[in-house]
């Protein structure tokens, strides 16, 4: 059997092929379907190792279509790089390392997200970009009108245009901000369409629908969590999910000294951000159905350690609850969070 290491790049990639006779063949090709097919399409079935990256999924599917066995490897798995030169890094060396790791099995396969969840992630990324862009426009418009002694009343982003229209701004000032207002109108419409699509996902997807029963977890956060985790069964417990989302403290230990720092911030940034935002929302609301136990728990932490620490702790708690709901096929039950209830520990 042939073993192939493929070091993927955005525009070009390095290929290292070890034939059945032990000969090494090295090529540099463009990261395009035609080039991959031309080089590897006529070769006998081989095992190909590539690192998880932006391009890895479509490349893996294309190579599998050519009859090869493709492994997408976790780039953080240290033994895969045991043969790598520590001070010299080149694409050719990386491809050789991947080829050798493929031959001896020194790799850990990364989880390959389903097509459905990959498309949902793309929708979430587009929505997030639109929301952030709208926030920049709001900030800029606010700064422009303040320079002229005007102030836009506070309120939701979605109703910002109505608040601006209600102001009797001078003609020259309205002319200056008109291009931004026009762009914001288009953004509002597109964000509304994106939200409608997410609402439909919640209605049609039983898992996301259950996740959305947790206080503070709306359609966007529930969908992002489901799209990031993909399969609850691939995790051994809530602790592993928290670590996967970068919500656990970094640990720097040596000998008898143990030190824990800030959260690791590993994994999907979008899902982690949304969970922390959900925690902040719970901390700030006065009352809500089923949210009192969670908010009370976080408020006690805030009193001792501050609100920022409490928000992250609550995000960790929410992560555990969401995972337990998915794993057990349940819906949120605030009674499980009452003091003395052992199942609450399992859920969180």
Predicted regions and their residues:
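Gly/Thr-rich phosphate-binding beta-strand-loop-beta motif of the actin/hexokinase/Hsp70
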Residues: 1-18, 98
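Phosphate-backbone recognition surface of nucleic-acid-processing proteins
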Residues: 27, 210-213, 219, 224-303, ...
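Short, basic/hydrophobic alpha-helical segments
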Residues: 32-47
